[in-house]
Amino acid sequence: MAASASSLALSSFNPKSLPFGVSRPASVSLLSPSLSFKLNSDSVSFSIAAKWNSPASRFARNVAITSEFEVEEDGFADVAPPKEQSFSADLKLFVGNLPFNVDSAQLAQLFESAGNVEMVEVIYDKITGRSRGFGFVTMSSVSEVEAAAQQFNGYELDGRPLRVNAGPPPPKREDGFSRGPRSSFGSSGSGYGGGGGSGAGSGNRVYVGNLSWGVDDMALESLFSEQGKVVEARVIYDRDSGRSKGFGFVTYDSSQEVQNAIKSLDGADLDGRQIRVSEAEARPPRRQY
């Protein structure tokens, strides 16, 4: 199966930006729109002001949209491409164990009590249209990210305790990855895929590449658990900076689950990027020190 994301981008009014985006139009209505046109000698400005309402919640925002068209000598206009908003990975929260009926608007409304919400994404299955049970929330500052993680990790929403994780784990979690080029994957202490569990020692694992920098262990586990029993899910981080290297590994309980994951999730959209899923190479023999 592939995945898609329903997202909301929230910001203050800016006449040269598109501060609000919604990819699931079924939950959006425009009320009392007003249109204005301004014609100059060299350009035409077109703007729409409207109030956005979500019928699923009381969350509402005023939205301003402005597009500028440059008029050519032949009378035709070229539309300037919109500028994409980008946010630091440090401002993004992973939110797992979401109730399947919770959409981006409801999630935004919930997290606004912790600070200014810039963007919200709930991940949906592209085929069925059903929520995958997790998403991402981007706040406007690191302090708000920390406050939201503290406030909502374990928070019960519609009978389900949320799992909220802020940013990459501290570098000390990666000690098991620093004692040799590849030997850490066979270490029973703290590296990836040590002892314990039939899947961990059997090589039933997949490589997951092209990960967004905001994806962590919990996001991987939430996505890949749909294809079978996940023994371990691990994103690989740089030892010095503590930031994601953009890839990771997921270990399953059986080889059949590995094949299911490759077939269903290779090319799936996760946090705005198409992930690459393939069978991982066999671990090298454990080194003796």
UniProtKB/Swiss-Prot annotation:
UniProt name for this protein: RNA-binding protein CP29B, chloroplastic
Location relative to the cell: Plastid, Chloroplast
Keyword Phosphoprotein: yes
Coarse class of the protein's main subcellular location: plastid
Residue ranges of the region described as Linker (Gly-rich): 170-203
Segments of skewed composition (Gly residues): 188-199
Highest classification ranks of the organism: Eukaryota, Viridiplantae, Streptophyta, Embryophyta, Tracheophyta
Low complexity bias (residue ranges): 178-187
InterPro entries: Euk_RNA-bind_prot, Nucleotide-bd_a/b_plait_sf, RBD_domain_sf, RRM2_NsCP33-like, RRM_dom
PTMs per UniProt: ADP-ribosylated by the Pseudomonas syringae type III effector HopU1. ADP-ribosylation reduces the ability of the protein to bind RNA. Phosphorylated on tyrosine residues after treatment with abscisic acid (ABA). Phosphorylation may reduce the ability of the protein to bind RNA.
Function recorded in the entry: Could be involved in splicing and/or processing of chloroplast RNA's.
